[in-house]
Amino acid sequence: MIEINFDKMGGLIPAVIQDYENGEVLMVAFMDKKTLDLTLRDGKTWFFSRTRNKYWMKGEESGNTQDVMEVLTDCDADTVVIKVRQNGPAACHTGNRSCFYVKWEDGQWVEHSNPLFNPEEVYKK
């Protein structure tokens, strides 16, 4: 039986979040055993925030949750790809559909931002 290897990165694994319908990479976040278990159990994506040092469910503040459709691991069992149905317009906390909106062009990073919501309104604290 294959077991996910959480040992290589201090108990964390990268999780690539991909749109189930079109294959677009929406975001990359980190999971530990508990958040992977919650994701598999609940069918919603859960992550571990290295910055805030806490667990969080995608969309818990914005409402832009993700329904888990399929989960895969790589040949080393130390990374997962989670294919989701994105609820709400955007996966990125910046309001963009994907976190990957900065592109290398002509020797520099160029932002192709098209926010679908205003983060200042959504993440009031």
From Swiss-Prot:
Top-rank lineage group of the source organism: Bacteria
Coiled-coil features, chain-numbered ranges: none
Free-text cofactor note: Binds 1 Mg(2+) ion per subunit.
Names of the cofactor(s): Mg(2+); Zn(2+)
Keyword Metal-binding set for record: yes
This protein's pathway: Amino-acid biosynthesis; L-histidine biosynthesis; L-histidine from 5-phospho-alpha-D-ribose 1-diphosphate: step 3/9
A GO CC term assigned to this protein in UniProt: cytoplasm
Residues annotated for Zn(2+) binding in this entry: C75, C92, C99
Root EC class: hydrolase
Reaction(s) catalysed by this chain's protein: 1-(5-phospho-beta-D-ribosyl)-5'-AMP + H2O = 1-(5-phospho-beta-D-ribosyl)-5-[(5-phospho-beta-D-ribosylamino)methylideneamino]imidazole-4-carboxamide
One GO term of the biological process aspect: L-histidine biosynthetic process
Molecular function (Gene Ontology), one example: magnesium ion binding
Keyword Ribosomal protein in record: no
Main subcellular localisation: cytoplasm
Subunit-level organization: Homodimer.
Family under the similarity heading: Belongs to the PRA-CH family.
Described purpose of this protein according to its UniProt entry: Catalyzes the hydrolysis of the adenine ring of phosphoribosyl-AMP.
Protein name in the entry: Phosphoribosyl-AMP cyclohydrolase
Source species taxonomy: Bacteria, Pseudomonadati, Thermodesulfobacteriota, Desulfuromonadia, Geobacterales
Primary gene name: hisI
